[in-house]
Swiss-Prot record:
<comment type="function">
    <text>Plays an important role in the de novo pathway of purine nucleotide biosynthesis. Catalyzes the first committed step in the biosynthesis of AMP from IMP.</text>
</comment>
<feature type="binding site" description="in other chain">
    <location>
        <position position="134"/>
    </location>
    <ligand>
        <name>IMP</name>
    </ligand>
</feature>
<keyword id="KW-0436">Ligase</keyword>
<dbReference type="InterPro" id="IPR042110">
    <property type="entry name" value="Adenylosuccinate_synth_dom2"/>
</dbReference>
<comment type="pathway">
    <text>Purine metabolism; AMP biosynthesis via de novo pathway; AMP from IMP: step 1/2.</text>
</comment>
<feature type="binding site" description="in other chain">
    <location>
        <position position="229"/>
    </location>
    <ligand>
        <name>IMP</name>
    </ligand>
</feature>
<dbReference type="GO" id="GO:0046040">
    <property type="term" value="P:IMP metabolic process"/>
</dbReference>
<dbReference type="InterPro" id="IPR018220">
    <property type="entry name" value="Adenylosuccin_syn_GTP-bd"/>
</dbReference>
<feature type="binding site" description="in other chain">
    <location>
        <begin position="18"/>
        <end position="21"/>
    </location>
    <ligand>
        <name>IMP</name>
    </ligand>
</feature>
<feature type="binding site" description="in other chain">
    <location>
        <position position="308"/>
    </location>
    <ligand>
        <name>IMP</name>
    </ligand>
</feature>
<feature type="binding site">
    <location>
        <begin position="45"/>
        <end position="47"/>
    </location>
    <ligand>
        <name>GTP</name>
    </ligand>
</feature>
<comment type="similarity">
    <text>Belongs to the adenylosuccinate synthetase family.</text>
</comment>
<keyword id="KW-0963">Cytoplasm</keyword>
<feature type="binding site">
    <location>
        <begin position="336"/>
        <end position="338"/>
    </location>
    <ligand>
        <name>GTP</name>
    </ligand>
</feature>
<feature type="active site" description="Proton donor">
    <location>
        <position position="46"/>
    </location>
</feature>
<feature type="binding site" description="in other chain">
    <location>
        <begin position="43"/>
        <end position="46"/>
    </location>
    <ligand>
        <name>IMP</name>
    </ligand>
</feature>
<dbReference type="GO" id="GO:0044208">
    <property type="term" value="P:'de novo' AMP biosynthetic process"/>
</dbReference>
C-alpha cells in the first residue's frame, strides 16, 4: 500500500497560556480532517468568536465548530466525564453535532470528585504560598497517573475492576484529606454512582484514538494537534514550581495522542504581541503601572474559565527564544497586535541581567527567573488602528518594524498575524498547511 501524503501541524502556546490558540486552531481547522487535544484538562479555556458570537471550549477541540472535522481527545488529557458531557450539551444546545464527531481515548486518566477535593484543600492549606491552580483536580489526577493508581476511561465499563481500583485509590486520598489536609473524606459510593451514571453517555465516543489517527494519516488526511496552556507552564521546562501538571511542549503531542514523532511536521507557536500571566510565579517584563492596566483593559485580560485577571507586561523575546528551542517552532503567529495601538513607545524584552551577566534566553526554574532583570529595548509605537487588517503591507510602518524585530530577537519567522477575534481577521504570510 502506498501511503498518501498528509501534513500535520502542532499549535503550541509559547508563553504562560492565554495566547489566543483557540481562534487560530478554529481558523486552521478549515484545512484538516481531524483536530486533537493531547494534554491538560478542563482547566484551559479556548475562546472563539464566530460571526460575533463568543464560544468557550474547555475540553473539546476547537475544530468542532467545523462540519466534517473529527475531533479527538487523546490519552494525554485528564478527563472529567461530568465536565465533558456538560460541554457537549452546551454545544448541542447551540445547534452543533458533537457526539458523532468526537472520539475519546479509552486510556485517558479520569478526574473524579476526590481529585477536586484534594486540589481545593491543598490550595486552601497553602494560603499565600499557593500555586494558583484552577481547583478542578487536574494536578491530583496527573499524580495518580504517574503513581500508577489512576482510573481510566476504559475502567468505567468494567464495574468490578472500577470498584477494586476505586477502593485502593480512595483509601490513599481520604487519608491525605483527613490526616494531612484536615478536610472531609470522599464517599466511595457517591463517586461510583456518579461515574456509572455518566458512563452510558460517554460510551459511544470511546475509541482507540491512536489507531484511528494512524488510519487517517495512512489515508493522507491532514491533522491538527491543539496544545493547551503554554510552554512556559510546562511541568519540566516552565517556571517550576509555578507550572501546570503536564508537558505543554510540541513533543507532548506524540505521547499524548499516540502518534509517532515523525507525524509532527510543522509547529506553529502562538504568542501575544505582549505578555500575560495568570496566578503566581515570576514575570520579568511585568508592568504594574498604568500601561499594564491599559493592556489588561483593552486586551480584556480575564481568564475564560476562571475569570481571574491576568498580569500584563511587555513582550519577552528572551522567554520566546526558550519556547522556540523547546518546541522546534517552524513559525510564529502574533495575536492581539491591536492592543498596542496608540502607544507612543513600546518596550521589547531582549534578555536579562542575572548576577551582573547578560542572558539572552529565559533561565530555568522560578528562583532563577525571579532573580532575572529584564533588559528592554525601546521601539516607536503607532497611532493607526490595526484592527481587522488582513494584508501585511497595510499595517502601520512601525507595527511592521515591531513585528520584524520580534522575529529577529526570537530567531523564527512570523507566519500569521491575528488582528481581531474573528477567524477572518488574520494576516497570512505563510500558511502552515499550504506554504
Amino acid at each position: 500500500m502506498i501511503r498518501k501524503m498528509s501534513k500535520n501541524v502542532v499549535v503550541i502556546g509559547t508563553q504562560w497560556g492565554d495566547e489566543g490558540k483557540g481562534k487560530i486552531v478554529d481558523w486552521l481547522a478549515e484545512s484538516v480532517q481531524g483536530v486533537v487535544r493531547f494534554q491538560g484538562g478542563h482547566n484551559a479555556g479556548h475562546t472563539l468568536w464566530i460571526n460575533g458570537k463568543k464560544t468557550i471550549l474547555r475540553l473539546i477541540p476547537s475544530g468542532i465548530m467545523h462540519d466534517g472535522v473529527t475531533c479527538f481527545i487523546g490519552n494525554g488529557v485528564v478527563l472529567s466525564p461530568e465536565a465533558l458531557l456538560r460541554e457537549i450539551e452546551e454545544l448541542e444546545a447551540a445547534g452543533l453535532d458533537v457526539r458523532s464527531r468526537l472520539q475519546v481515548s479509552e486510556i485517558c486518566t479520569l478526574i473524579l470528585p476526590y481529585h477536586v477535593a484534594v486540589d481545593k484543600a491543598r490550595e486552601a492549606r497553602k494560603g499565600e504560598g499557593k500555586i494558583g491552580t484552577t481547583g478542578r483536580g487536574i494536578g491530583p489526577a496527573y499524580e495518580d497517573k504517574v503513581a500508577r493508581r489512576a482510573l481510566r476511561v476504559q475502567d468505567l465499563f468494567n464495574p468490578a475492576l472500577f470498584d477494586e481500583k476505586l477502593a485502593e485509590v480512595l483509601d490513599y486520598h481520604n487519608f491525605v484529606l483527613t490526616q494531612y489536609l484536615g478536610a472531609e473524606p470522599v464517599s466511595a459510593n457517591e463517586v461510583r454512582d456518579q461515574a456509572m451514571a455518566l458512563a452510558p453517555a460517554l460510551a459511544p465516543m470511546v475509541r482507540d484514538v491512536s489507531s484511528n489517527l494512524f488510519a487517517l494519516q495512512q489515508e493522507g488526511k491532514n491533522l491538527l494537534f491543539e496544545g493547551a496552556q503554554g510552554a512556559l507552564l510546562d511541568v519540566d521546562h516552565g517556571t517550576y514550581p509555578f507550572v501546570t501538571s503536564s508537558n505543554c511542549v510540541a513533543g507532548a503531542a506524540s505521547a499524548g495522542a499516540g502518534v509517532g514523532p515523525q507525524a509532527l511536521q510543522y509547529v506553529l507557536g502562538i504568542t501575544k504581541a505582549y505578555t500575560t500571566r495568570v496566578g503566581s510565579g515570576p514575570f520579568p517584563t511585568e508592568l504594574v503601572d498604568e500601561i499594564g492596566t491599559r493592556l489588561a483593559t483593552i486586551g480584556k485580560e480575564f481568564g475564560s474559565v476562571t475569570g481571574r485577571p491576568r498580569r500584563c507586561g511587555w513582550f519577552d523575546g528572551a522567554a520566546l527564544k526558550r519556547s522556540v528551542r523547546l518546541n522546534g517552532i517552524s513559525g510564529l503567529c502574533i495575536t492581539k497586535l491591536d492592543v498596542l495601538d496608540g502607544l507612543e513607545t513600546i518596550q521589547l524584552g531582549v534578555g536579562y541581567r542575572v548576577n551582573g551577566e547578560f542572558r539572552d534566553v529565559l533561565p530555568y526554574g522560578a528562583h532563577a527567573v525571579a532573580q532575572a532583570q529584564a533588559v528592554l529595548e525601546e521601539l516607536p509605537g503607532w497611532t493607526e488602528s490595526t484592527v481587522g487588517i488582513t494584508e501585511y503591507s497595510k499595517l502601520p510602518v512601525n507595527a511592521r518594524r515591531y513585528l520584524e524585530r520580534v522575529a529577529e530577537v526570537c530567531g523564527v519567522p512570523i507566519d500569521l498575524v491575528s488582528t481581531g477575534p474573528d477567524r477572518n481577521e488574520t494576516i497570512v504570510l505563510r500558511h502552515p498547511f499550504k506554504g
